[in-house]
Amino acid sequence: MIVLSSAPSLGPLLALGALRSPFKKPSAGADFPRARLVLASLRPDLRKLAAYERVCGFATGDDGLPVTYPHVLGFPLAMRLMSGRDFPLPLLGLVHTSIEIVRHAELPGDGTYEISVHIEKLSPHRRGTEATVVTEVRVADDVVWESRSTYLARHRTETAPADGPREQERAPLPAVEEWRIAGDVGRRYGAASGDRNPIHLHPLTARLFGFPRAIAHGMWTVARCLAAHGAPERARVTAEFRAPVLLPGTVTYAEDDAGRFELRDGDRVHVEGRVERLGPGPLQGRPGSVPLPGDQ
């Protein structure tokens, strides 16, 4: 365990990770850093929190943190691990493919938290290698929030794992509303979250990485969906990132009574996920889920 006195600055970490990327040799069998980085006492910056709530569509001034906000608090620690010399995957081109969030209790916006981040594993993927990054938020000794994010480094594989069963095509979820996303969403979210990856900021910088225009942050798309959908105090949220959202753009938000949600543009799904209410149980651990209203 490595205890940090303050959160690392994301800008230098992004630059360092970019410089080291050409020298990485990604492989699912490679060794990876086992250290757990810890911020022992962190209080959210209420000004940045309010900016985050505004850009993502959450109500401002609520007592509790949005369900996605602890990811922002832990992201600098994750970036320090993934930009390090001993992390085998190149930071440039690393794609956030999914996230699972478990919130065991509401987190007050004015609370003080211990944040810890570690890399759980590397896994073979048909398109390369995937890293699983775990973030945990504690109050005293209790885990009150945790997440698992997967990040994919695309590269040629000698023996790609066999494809699993094909997903059954399902009908699109019922459309709820259409959203017009402004071209500055990436810059506004970057200012609120600290994640100023150039692919999100401007068409010119996005073109350097092969995108015709700037793209929205994946975690902004999930947060925006959850601001519309809502989440119980004790909840499990899962989301998979399917395709980038170009900025500016128009997308359709859709959901059903079973807790599923998606963001799509015509037949193209950008993100899909589900919200489940967790039953009563101890803070630490993974209590079972119970259906949301409409699941019966």
Range-by-range predicted roles:
Residues 1-31, 76-79, 97-181, 244-247, ...:
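HotDog/MaoC-like acyl-thioester-processing domains
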Residues 204-272:
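Catalytic-pocket segment enriched in acidic/His residues
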